């Protein structure tokens, strides 16, 4: 008997790299999108940590009044933030090499642009990597579609909104109290709470939380016992098994009796599509709302108070909301503007600024 041995052709270094990048046997899948995601997210994370701890004050309003955001300049975890780049920079791309010195770059808030741009590229690539891994494994592509909701929301507040407002100084600060400040100012300038797209987003997030809790509790309460009473139910299941872990008929029957029959799903695919689509569509709408308000297509406003036949104001909840928004706007950039833009321009409009008399 004759045995023929043929030497295996050695793959080039590039081919080995390609096989490693696209291999689904790695503990963590890299993928071609990952080759860009990993360095950009590492860069954004590193710069964010350094800036959050030690960045000097930033002239955010462009009026030579720097705002300190780092821990070493007196902030704590709650009040600290990476302060957005200066209004003097506007929408200009401001990498380190565009500044005359590192001190100038820090003073004008260069780290904010560095973090935001690398972060956005990183999460875009993470979404692409989700699609790539699904493709390699023969899965359907809906995971990356669902992830597009938070990606679109981040893009709206970090990129679209500053573009619409004309300056990256209007972007969301990278910190806890900075995020709240951004929300309050957004309400003051755009009346976002009265925008229907934001209302859909609230319904999506809160509704998604409710449906998630309902689904999780129903499934956990209707597990099929495959073990004896003295063993843990966990021993009755294995990852990837073909059999159902829980009894959807029992869950459907329980929920149908708790509310009414047609409030419950009896089809697992329809149920899980609903659980995925509800919050995703809601967050998509919120991102679209922020993106349109970026160009000042704002929420509903009721700036004209209701008047009686004598010209007296009939107070409504809209008047309370208007007064709150004006108060927010007065506090915002108080050294850059003498008055809120609503009060400083245009014809005078009757607004209820007097409290009704309380008899009692």
From Swiss-Prot:
Protein's cellular compartments: Cellular thylakoid membrane
Listed name of the protein: Photosystem II protein D1 2
InterPro entries named in the record: D1/D2, Photo_II_D1/D2_sf, Photo_RC_L/M, Photo_RC_L/M_CS, PSII_D1
Annotated source species: Synechocystis sp. (strain ATCC 27184 / PCC 6803 / Kazusa)
Effect of substituting residue 255 to W: Herbicide resistance
Residue ranges the record marks as coiled coil: none
Binding residue positions for pheophytin a: 126, 147
Site (Stabilizes free radical intermediate): 190
EC number: 1.10.3.9
Matching Pfam families: Photo_RC (PF00124)
Chain residues that bind Fe cation: 215, 272
């Amino acid at each position: 008997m004759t045995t023929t041995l043929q030497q295996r052709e050695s793959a080039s270094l590039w081919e080995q790299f390609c096989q490693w990048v696209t291999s689904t046997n790695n503990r963590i899948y890299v993928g071609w999108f990952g080759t860009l995601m990993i360095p950009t997210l590492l860069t954004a994370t590193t710069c964010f940590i350094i800036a959050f701890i030690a960045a000097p004050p930033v002239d955010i309003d462009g009026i030579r009044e720097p705002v300190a955001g780092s821990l070493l300049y007196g902030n704590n975890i709650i009040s600290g933030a990476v302060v957005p780049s200066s209004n003097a920079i506007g929408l200009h791309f401001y990498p380190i090499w565009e500044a005359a010195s590192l001190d100038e770059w820090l003073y004008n808030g260069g780290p904010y642009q560095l973090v935001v741009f690398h972060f956005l590229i990183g999460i875009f690539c993470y979404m692409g990597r989700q699609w790539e891994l699904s493709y390699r494994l023969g899965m359907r592509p809906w995971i990356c579609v669902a992830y597009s909701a938070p990606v679109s929301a981040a893009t709206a507040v970090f990129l679209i909104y500053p573009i619409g407002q004309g300056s990256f100084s209007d972007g969301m600060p990278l910190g806890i109290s900075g995020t709240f400040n951004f929300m309050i100012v957004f309400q003051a300038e755009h009346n976002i709470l009265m925008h229907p797209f934001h209302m859909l987003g609230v319904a999506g997030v809160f509704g998604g939380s409710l449906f998630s809790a309902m689904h999780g509790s129903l499934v956990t309460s209707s597990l099929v016992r495959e073990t004896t009473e003295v063993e843990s139910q966990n021993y009755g299941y294995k990852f990837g098994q073909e059999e159902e872990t829980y009894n959807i008929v029992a869950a459907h029957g329980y929920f149908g009796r708790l509310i009414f029959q047609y409030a419950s799903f009896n089809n697992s695919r329809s149920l899980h599509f609903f659980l995925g689509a509800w919050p995703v569509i809601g967050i998509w709408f919120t991102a679209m709302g922020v993106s349109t308000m970026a160009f000042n297509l704002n929420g509903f406003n009721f700036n004209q108070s209701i008047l009686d036949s004598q010209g007296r104001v009939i107070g409504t909840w809209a008047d309370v909301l208007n007064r709150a928004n004006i108060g927010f706007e007065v506090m915002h950039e108080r050294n850059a503007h003498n008055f809120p833009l609503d009060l400083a321009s245009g014809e005078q409009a009757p607004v209820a600024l007097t409290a009704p008399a309380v008899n009692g």
